[in-house]
């Protein structure tokens, strides 16, 4: 097992139309307004940006994200990531009942030296930290959609 590789999956059911949810998710530079753990997003061009994240643990992750796929008709947004994390992440938004089901998938390798150094003993803590970040994202997105 490569202790520095992670695969995450989160599913959120939201009481908003899929097109509205997708519209919020595709405006990546606005994530810091509703997602507390996304501290900053700086656009480099129309497909690339630098994001800074910090959840519960006292460290910051910095990644450069480049859009790989934007397909509103399929409800898919996908990006490649380099920097402290290297890999990809994807949002898939589909109709579900009267609202939307949001699937977030991510496969990354940790590149940040400190996190690599503590890969084995710190793995459960890093997974819990990610879960807290995703919980904050779900709550923030729900609140943003309620406005």
Regions found by a protein language model. Give the residues of each.
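Generic structural detector for well-ordered beta-strands
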Residues: 11-15, 42, 52, 92, ...
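Short, contiguous strand/loop micro-motifs
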Residues: 16, 77, 124-125
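Beta-strand/loop substructures that line and gate deep hydrophobic ligand-binding cavities in soluble
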Residues: 81-135
């Amino acid at each position: 097992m490569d202790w520095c590789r992670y695969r995450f999956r989160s599913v959120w059911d939201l009481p908003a139309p899929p097109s509205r949810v997708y519209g919020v998710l595709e405006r990546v530079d606005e994530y810091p307004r509703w997602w507390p753990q996304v501290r900053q997003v700086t656009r480099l061009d129309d497909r690339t940006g630098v994001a800074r994240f910090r959840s519960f643990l006292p460290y910051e992750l910095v990644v450069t994200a480049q859009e790989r796929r934007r397909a509103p008709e399929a409800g898919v947004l996908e990006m490649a990531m380099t920097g402290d994390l290297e890999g990809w992440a994807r949002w898939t938004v589909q109709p579900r009942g009267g609202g939307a089901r949001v699937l977030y998938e991510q496969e990354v390798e940790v590149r940040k030296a400190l996190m690599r150094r503590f890969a084995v003993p710190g793995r459960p803590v890093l997974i819990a930290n990610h879960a807290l970040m995703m919980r904050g994202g779900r709550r923030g997105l729900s609140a943003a959609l309620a406005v």
